[in-house]
Amino acid sequence: MKTKRRDAVASTRRIEYNTRPMATANIPPIPAEPIRAMTPREAGHTLFASFLGWTLDAFDFFVLVFVLPKIGADFHRSVADIAFAITMTLAMRPIGAALFGWLADRYGRRTPLMIDVLLYSVVEVLSGLAPTYGSFLVLRALYGIGMGGEWGVGASLAMEAVAPKWRGFFSGLLQEGYAVGYLLAAAAYFFVYPHFGWRAMFFIGGAPALLTLYIRAKVPESEAWQRTRPDRTAILRALKKNLPMFLYLSVFLTAMSFVSHGTQDMYPTFLEKQRGLGPHHVAEIAIIYNIGAVMGGLFFGYVSDKWGRRRSIATALIIGIFIIPLWIGARSIALLTFGAFLMQFMVQGAFGVIPAHLSELSPPEVRGLFSGMAYQVGVLMAANAAFLEALIAERWGFANALGIVAVTVFVLGAVIVMLGPERAGGSLHLEA
């Protein structure tokens, strides 16, 4: 009897011990909120919001490019001194990419994007109120944080909403928000500056704040992010594992940032200072070459879905090399304008492939941080492009300065992209 009682007690204890963990092991985790795919209409709103965010961000940046000499005159500084404000903006962009990219990967894309848009809008208005050269530099540095945060978050949100077969085309559309922003800045220079001065152009830059209302009302959270939802440990692990890829992309984006900023930032100043053109002619040429930029981005973005990302980028850069003499050396205004149109068709054609290429090469757990940081580290390394060209121009003229920089970085960009990897059309979701 005692033996049977002991066996029964022991059996009961074993049952109690063994079933306790089983009771919790079979309960599935409850998600914070249900995951659902975007509808086509929601994907359209997402693409439009991301495009508009990058467009207005670029507008706020390029406003300064058109009024460098005028701000210099007001603050009694040289063009090179004011061009240093561009360097400050570009140099601070990685900080914005790190901050808002981390927030976007950790907490979702929508809210960080709205905060970022508000930040750069407010700082842009304050730039128009700057009383001194020093305060202007500080504000342009703060603006760089906002500008740096927008690209990685917006591009990740947009590319995660697009079907793989259309990713290249919509990559070109998204990236050419940059050219459209440049075009709008040229239009503001044409219509606003002659009547109200350079400060009014910065005041217009506060308009993007209204975009936050649209994002809040129409743009859902990314499905790809909802399925991943990485914690702090997963983010750090993914960054460490993919460090070689990050270093490669940073080097590649350094060359590409020199391609873009080296052909754009000082070109209006070249037209004004060396070719003797007035504000209206400068604005007209800028509008035309930015139309070329938009067309190039859409064309090469679409072609990259057929040819591949690397081949499309390299082709645009190689053709661009042969356009340089016409771009800076044409004698007539008509030919100079045509050269500028072709140049930006190729430059932004190559850059139009970048959002898709970076999104496909970035780990899903850290796409916002990884792609944004690689992009902005490249920008940081090229932050002195305008300042460098201004210094070279003081000795050899703007045409030679632009040409030397352009031919060098076009060759480097084509070589680097062809040496790198490619995942054209690959899934942007975390693989099980």
What are these regions (language model features)?
Residues 65, 244-294:
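Extracytoplasmic gate region of multi-pass secondary transporters
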Residues 17-18, 22-59:
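Cytosolic juxtamembrane N-terminal segment immediately preceding the first transmembrane helix
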Residues 304-354:
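C-terminal transmembrane helical hairpin of 12-TM major facilitator-type secondary transporters
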Residues 95-131, 307:
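Conserved MFS/SLC helix-loop-helix module at the cytosolic interface between two early adjacent transmembrane helices
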Residues 65-95, 280:
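Extracellular/periplasmic helix-loop-helix junction of adjacent transmembrane segments
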